[in-house]
């Protein structure tokens, strides 16, 4: 049924459940698997005038990018260890300086994936409104089915 799966993780405990499900599904279906983690660009406040804005120095940008790269490396190393433990082959991808939902949708499209697997934190009410939901954005903007793994009870 599914032959090319994109599995998204941010390294959180909730995402780990998504990784477990995605790995098991890819193994059961003998599907090609890409595991992706996305790190966002350094948030910059250009302000609305006067001296309210903050623009980072190049050193701050470089430091942030290095920290994101290190974090993404750990996230993907953890996913790699989980894949090796159950004998599932995968490709591993870090997309830096990107909006997660957009990067997930674009990667699924460019790699010809026919399923996206991701976990959701299950935020509700105002928390969801203000914090947003990458999963919701992928569901709305994606063109392939999305398997959503809920936060464990």
Please state what every model-predicted region is.
Residues 1, 77-116:
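Structural beta-alpha unit
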């Amino acid at each position: 049924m599914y032959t090319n799966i994109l599995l998204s993780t941010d390294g959180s405990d909730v995402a780990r459940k998504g990784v477990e499900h995605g790995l098991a599904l890819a193994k059961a279906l003998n599907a090609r698997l890409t595991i992706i983690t996305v790190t966002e660009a350094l948030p910059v406040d250009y302000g609305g005038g006067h001296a309210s804005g903050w623009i980072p120095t190049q050193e701050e940008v470089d430091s942030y990018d290095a920290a994101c790269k290190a974090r993404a490396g750990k996230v993907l190393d953890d996913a790699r260890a989980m894949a090796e433990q159950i004998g599932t082959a995968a490709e591993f991808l870090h997309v830096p300086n990107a909006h997660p939902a957009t990067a997930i949708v674009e990667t699924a499209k460019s790699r010809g994936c026919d399923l996206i697997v991701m976990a959701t934190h299950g935020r509700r009410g105002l928390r969801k409104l203000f914090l947003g939901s990458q999963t919701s954005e992928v569901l709305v903007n994606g063109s392939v089915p999305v398997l959503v793994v809920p936060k464990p009870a």
